[in-house]
Swiss-Prot record:
This is Male-specific sperm protein Mst87F. Belongs to the MST(3)CGP family. It comes from the Eukaryota. GO terms for biological process: cell differentiation; spermatogenesis. Coiled coil: none annotated. The gene is Mst87F. GO terms for molecular function: structural molecule activity. Testis. It holds the Pfam family Mst87F. Changing P16A: In strain: MEL01. InterPro entries: Mst87F. It comes from Drosophila melanogaster (Fruit fly). Keywords: Developmental protein, Differentiation, Repeat, Spermatogenesis. The keyword Nucleotide-binding does not apply. One of its GO terms (cellular component) is sperm flagellum.
Length: 56
């Protein structure tokens, strides 16, 4: 699993990019906007980019 108990990332560079349930760590890709996230990020419920949430 890319992100442990919280599900996979959006993108190919999982592993060190993601915390188990919190916001993604840096180094894999940016958040480009509320609903447009870079590799290894997903859109969270409040418009930020988080690990383990589905895209909006």
């Amino acid at each position: 699993m890319c992100c442990g108990p919280c599900g996979p990332c959006c993108g190919p560079c999982c592993g060190p990019c993601c915390g188990p349930c919190g916001p993604c760590g840096g180094g894999c890709g940016p958040c480009y906007g509320p609903n447009v996230c870079g590799p290894c990020y997903a859109c969270g419920p409040c418009g930020g980019c988080y690990c383990g949430y589905p895209c909006c």
